A protein has these predicted regions:
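Bacterial N-terminal signal peptides that target proteins for export
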Residues: 1-10
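Bacterial N-terminal signal peptides
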Residues: 9-18
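Second-shell loop/turn segments in exported
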Residues: 62-64, 132-138, 193-203, 259, ...
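Acidic, Ser/Thr- and proline-rich intrinsically disordered linker/docking segments
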Residues: 78-168
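Phosphoinositide-binding peripheral membrane targeting modules
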Residues: 54-96
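A structural "domain/chain start" motif
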Residues: 22-48, 160-218, 251, 284-289, ...
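Extracytoplasmic/secreted envelope proteins and their assembly/folding machinery
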Residues: 55, 71, 143-147, 151, ...
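Surface-exposed short loop/turn segments
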Residues: 81-117, 228-278, 295
Length: 315
């Protein structure tokens, strides 16, 4: 494919991006273009829509689906950043062309197809006390504005932890000794990922939790999968609990991965354990997730959740 055609594809992709997350919507209701990463019930992952703060809640409307989180249910809001693909379907077509193109021109097009976005992570509770994280990508600079508006509307935020943590690997810790037994319980409760003494962005921890809930449910291993804090779990006599703690974290670069195919990988290692009601450790394992080539950095959490869900199903 020649350079002229590559330039045309890039122009189409970037034009689409300008109409999408690259620019906030301008109207009286302060609607903002957003992409749903994960966490909203009945909303497809990576679907796009309009984000509005109105009538005491955060509303996401995509196509015929509208979901609203009441500000009173929100207990924390975090802002992160991500580098993602611009241009929607046009961007996908252009990126495919870049792969087939000569190395130098394909790499240049990959750079043009990158755009930085804010990642809005909204922690909230359902009517049963279950913990949810809604993760949304918005145009750069819109995340803090949405956070401020939600706080003004009555949303709660947690105080800063004050921890001075660094990306890397935690101090070596021994895995707990697990009882050799099959996991035959009818239900399991998923707890949010603990950071330990490793720095990891809030959106990674939140996405890990949401993907774990989704993947463990899809595995069919347990009749019931409860979210952290769900009061209904208290009535299950054989309830198990899944704990995860970050053991190491390396945030790579999506653009570097796609240009070089060698460098820029994102990796997360966690210590995963399953305990019974008496606190006995039934399963303990160190698991690693990674994104080596295509995909946003947050994709590492989905990979990690797949590995853990598969391990649980084998027991």
């Amino acid at each position: 494919m020649d350079r002229v055609n590559l330039r045309m594809l890039a122009a189409i992709a970037l034009s689409s991006a300008v109409c999408g997350l690259a620019q906030p919507a301008e109207n009286a209701e302060n609607k903002v273009d957003a992409r749903h990463v994960i966490g909203l019930d009945n909303v497809r992952r990576n679907s796009t829509g309009l984000l509005t703060i109105r009538d005491g809640g955060l509303q996401f409307q995509g196509g015929k689906t509208t979901v609203k989180l009441l500000t009173a249910s929100i207990d924390d809001i975090a802002i992160g950043t991500e580098t993602t693909q611009a241009g929607g379907k046009a961007g996908t077509v252009a990126k495919t062309a870049a792969i087939a193109a000569p190395y130098d021109s394909g790499a240049a097009l990959s750079i043009l197809l990158r755009t930085n976005v804010d990642v809005l992570t909204v922690s909230n509770r359902d009517s049963s006390g279950g913990l949810h994280y809604a993760i949304l990508a918005v145009a750069k600079g819109q995340g803090e504005q949405q956070r401020s508006q939600l706080i003004t509307a009555g949303a709660h935020v947690a105080a800063p932890s004050g921890q001075d943590l660094k990306e890397g690997k935690s101090a070596a810790a021994e895995m707990p000794t697990a009882i050799s037994t099959k996991l035959s319980a009818s239900a399991i409760q998923i707890e949010p990922m603990g950071a330990g003494d490793v720095w990891i962005p809030a959106e990674f921890r939140a996405a890990m939790y949401e993907f774990l809930v989704m993947r463990v449910r899809q595995s069919g291993k347990f009749q019931q999968v409860f979210r952290s804090g769900d009061r209904a779990a208290a009535n299950v006599h054989d309830l198990l609990t899944l704990h995860t703690t970050v053991e190491k974290f390396k945030q790579g670069s999506q653009m570097q991965r796609e240009i070089t195919t060698v460098f820029g990988s994102t990796k997360v290692g966690v210590d995963a354990s399953v305990t019974d009601r008496d606190g006995h450790v039934l399963l303990a394992q160190r698991v690693q997730g990674k994104v080596l080539f295509f995909g946003e950095n947050l994709g590492v959490t989905n990979d990690l959740a797949k590995h853990i869900a598969k391990r649980l199903k084998q027991e």
